Amino acid sequence: GKLAIRVDAQGWGGGDARQIKTVLEAVAGELLSKFPGRPLAPIRVSRSTQAPVALYERGPGGEIRIELTASGPDAGPYVYEFSHEFCHVLSNYERHPHHAVTRNHQWFEEALCEVASLYTLKTLALSWQKAAPSAELAAAARQLRTSVQTLESATHAAWSTGVPDDALANATPYLQAFGH
């Protein structure tokens, strides 16, 4: 069956919870299509002022809890953040021992989840251009393409020297701007 996603009704800074739910369902549908038959508990999505996160602690009904910092009516930040956090869920993040960050390998999961965000932004931009779930999201296709271009140019700029430490220093403002 379809993955159940519940979005908190309030706190989205002008974003409509029903529209946000439609966006998140599109993200989940795209990524879950790569994991046929993968069962998942329902997901509850809330707004956070701290950082986007897939929480280790389940909700009272056993639901997976994801917090996003995205707000407002633009779909791009929701696609980007939810893709990243949902990727953590799909990569069995909850199996880390005592939910400790696995320092030696966490970078790989983070890189994979960034790729998932870029992939989903690109894929939804293309599919919404042809057949969006709503008129508002048809208009958002261009904005998603712009988000992809911004992220890709920031990545290229960050690696301009070819030195990993420089890349991290150059990427820090971009990561902070996108909630990391």
Where are these regions (language model features)?
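Hydrophobic (often cysteine-bearing) scaffold residues that line and stabilize catalytic clefts
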Residues: 20, 24, 79, 105, ...
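Auxiliary, metal-adjacent structural segments of Zn-dependent hydrolase domains
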Residues: 2-73
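Sec-exported extracytoplasmic/periplasmic mature domains
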Residues: 29-36, 91, 95, 117-126
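Pan-zinc metallopeptidase signature
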Residues: 154-180
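Intrinsic-disorder-associated interaction segments
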Residues: 13, 17-20, 24, 133, ...
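Post-HExxH zinc-binding segment in Zn-dependent metallohydrolases
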Residues: 103-155
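Short pre-active-site segment immediately N-terminal to the catalytic Zn-binding motif
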Residues: 65-82, 96-105
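Active-site recognition of the HExxH zinc-binding catalytic motif
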Residues: 79-97, 110, 114, 118
